[in-house]
Amino acid sequence: MTLKNKSIVVLLSGGLDSSTVTGIAKKSEAKIFGLSFDYGQRHKKELNSASIIAKHFDIDEFKIIKLDLSLWGGSSLTDTQKNIPIEGVQTNKIPNTYVPGRNTIFISVALSYAEAIDADFIGLGVNALDYSGYPDCRPDYIKKFQELADLANKRGRENNPIKLWTPLLDLNKEEIIKLAFDNHVPLDKTWSCYSGNSKPCGKCDSCRIRNAAYEKWLNNNNKK
């Protein structure tokens, strides 16, 4: 799949994954339209990181959409009465940091935007190996949403569908960090932590997964 001279809407949260997707798209000479969401998340610092990444890669357009999912809560990311789990990553259950329907809502907005500007792709930073077990980051979810997208808009019905582009889907976090360096992502400007603090907590799932992968990448590169 070539992205050169193609238009792509990237869901840019400001985290490691979405920033890496943006970097890959930039290196591929795509026309990039970034979308970020102010959805009532406690870690609003990611919005600042998203803006910095958008400027770093000089993308064609960047929008922050106000869409307050904290109105009904259901997640420790949008409800400050719930504690963010810090006991370590658990693989046998979906953690309370899962935001009900978040990816479905965000990708739907991106699909509408992409169709309006006649973009060819929607870039997503989802990955199914090193993640917190969210149901909307898995390959079967992406496959089914693509099927929905093909049916749900004019371009799909005219056999010119907008494609979901998920270059990180089958990669682990260490591989993503390597890709980030290869594509000139300023990792120190990205934000992964779920806490609303000014510095990463180092204890939430997102911090633990990222830090462990970075340590592994560092160790492997020091051996070379």
Swiss-Prot record:
What residues does Zn(2+) bind to? 193, 201, 204, 207
Record text on cofactor binding: Binds 1 zinc ion per subunit.
Q: Pfam families from the entry?
A: QueC (PF06508)
Keyword Zinc among UniProt keywords: yes
Q: What is its pathway?
A: Purine metabolism; 7-cyano-7-deazaguanine biosynthesis
Entry's EC annotation: 6.3.4.20
* Domain of life of the native organism: Bacteria
One GO-annotated biological process of the protein? queuosine biosynthetic process
Q: Which reaction does it catalyse?
A: 7-carboxy-7-deazaguanine + NH4(+) + ATP = 7-cyano-7-deazaguanine + ADP + phosphate + H2O + H(+)
Record's keyword annotation contains ATP-binding? yes
* Molecular functions (GO terms): ATP binding; ligase activity, forming carbon-nitrogen bonds; zinc ion binding
Q: Which Gene3D superfamilies match?
A: HUPs
- Where does the chain bind ATP? 12-22
UniProt keyword terms in alphabetical order? ATP-binding, Ligase, Metal-binding, Nucleotide-binding, Queuosine biosynthesis, Zinc
InterPro entries per record:
QueC (IPR018317), Rossmann-like_a/b/a_fold (IPR014729)
Swiss-Prot/TrEMBL cofactor(s): Zn(2+)
The entry's family comment says: Belongs to the QueC family.
Q: Which function does this protein serve?
A: Catalyzes the ATP-dependent conversion of 7-carboxy-7-deazaguanine (CDG) to 7-cyano-7-deazaguanine (preQ(0)).
- Record-given protein name: 7-cyano-7-deazaguanine synthase
Q: Which organism is it from?
A: Prochlorococcus marinus (strain AS9601)
